[in-house]
């Protein structure tokens, strides 16, 4: 049984909202697109990842990420509490498993915003998930976005650009590709894929 806005009723498995995974290279605008979509449709639940990365200005623990120590992340991994986890630019990121499964069981739309490694792990453990690749309009635009952040030293940006080349080459592994030429348009397209009516 799943709880719906009108009460408790059975939800056939094929009618249940599926898990949607949004991935793409660093700097492509994943967070911006998701924030725009959720502003209009807060019913789409975005999983909050755990990370060993230090907070950026304005980021809040439990809202943007669960900021954890290396030891805490080791425990989450060892206890199987993460649906997926990956290391990127010297930091680890992971999706807490239980919260995702609970929301899917209740029939709520769930969105994960994760990197390529994480998307591959989700594909392995939950093959019914829809994997969406967010691509930049061009390589030059991606470089401009990454260098324009001004929040990271040049060596970190260089690592992100190297990783972006690998991630862009993996685009064929995804079910759908959206090109981020307009945040509003891509958010609308993503919303249709998440299937929120």
Curated annotation (Swiss-Prot):
Catalytic activity: GMP + ATP = GDP + ADP
Highest taxon in the source lineage: Bacteria
Annotated family: Belongs to the guanylate kinase family.
GO MF terms held by the record: ATP binding; guanylate kinase activity
GO CC terms in record: cytosol
Leader sequence residues: none
InterPro entries with a match to the protein in the record: GK/Ca_channel_bsu, Guanylate_kin-like_dom, Guanylate_kinase, Guanylate_kinase_CS, P-loop_NTPase
Name of the featured protein: Guanylate kinase
Predominant location category: cytoplasm
Protein role: Essential for recycling GMP and indirectly, cGMP.
Cell compartment(s), UniProt: Cytoplasm
Keyword hit for Ubl conjugation: no
Record domain Guanylate kinase-like: where: 17-195
E.C. number: 2.7.4.8
Keywords: ATP-binding, Cytoplasm, Kinase, Nucleotide-binding, Transferase
Binding-site list for ATP: 24-31
